[in-house]
Amino acid sequence: KKVDGAISSGLKALEMMQKPSGRFEWYGRAQYGATGLALYTMLASGGSIHDPPAAKALDWLLKNPFPWGQRGDWDTYEISLVAVALSFAIPQMPLSASRDRAMSLLQRAADWLVSAQWKGGGWSYTSKPETHDHSNSQFGIMGLRAAVNAGVKITTPVWEREVNHWKTAQLKDGGWGYHACYKDQTATGRSTSTMTAAGVMCLAMSLASSPKEKAPEDLAKDANIARGLLAMRSHWDRSMGRSAPINFYLLYSVERACMVTGTRLLGDLDWYVEGSWALLHAQDPDGLWALGQDQVKDQCFALLFLKRAYVPVRTPSNAKPADPVSPAPPPLPPGRPREME
């Protein structure tokens, strides 16, 4: 009940951030990505495209053409989040001109992401990257997988490049860093908590989407993913201990990695109970988790974590469309379940 209440009040607070036109924004801009993220959050939390806030957000996305390639500084993030939002909206849309526009926009977003993939795998901010980073890359992969779930075809080499990239970029400790750096063909550098979770999710999604696809229930058994999950556990105490400020991006990354791989426990850690405890104690009486320029983004990340909503992976062997909305989480036990060390 506490989690349900936090989600309900959090959604109401998110809706208050919507502009009269229907869009959302962060940093005073990035309105396409912010609107896509907010719409995805509302729909993944059980909302309908007929709910006024969601309807206005969807209408704004469909009626305001994306400035393809005209800005470049946020393109991968924004295009990917619009793709995810559309993949959740389209199944609810009746056959109509609006649905056709949504599918056309989703197809164009997928085409852009394919063309923007770096030659060695991964994405950067722009359509013609000279390198990559793992933050943009996790959104690029999520956007492509969302498009696949809505019926868009993605060619095999796209996924093969990603599988190879994430396996070769994995560091000795099992984690990933912001960039993939190599010495004598061996990945070097320092892993981080958020990029390690991103690496697990990206490798899992890529494996589930490649010709030699793994069924969702087998993803956590993959040797590279298993090492990544162990690294996530090691990073948790340093990044999400009781005295640490909440890292909303990290929580969202952990949630996606664990949900895609079907991981309930990271070693001895119940990541959902621990993260939910932190979020429940950080939410203010108005349903807000954050203020300032990151408000929309962090509000959505908190809600998606609590709802355990994510872009699902489906393979030919389990091709029946799954409900993208995760079941309601179980009630939390009273108090903190365990002191973080």
Enumerate the predicted regions with their spans.
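Conserved, well-structured interaction surfaces
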Residues: 60-67
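Extreme N-terminal leader/anchor segments
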Residues: 9-15
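An alpha-helical repeat/solenoid feature that recognizes helix-turn-helix modules
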Residues: 1-9, 23-53, 67-160, 168-274, ...
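Active-site neighborhood of glycoside hydrolase catalytic domains
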Residues: 165
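N-terminal glycine-/serine-/threonine-rich phosphate-binding loop
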Residues: 18
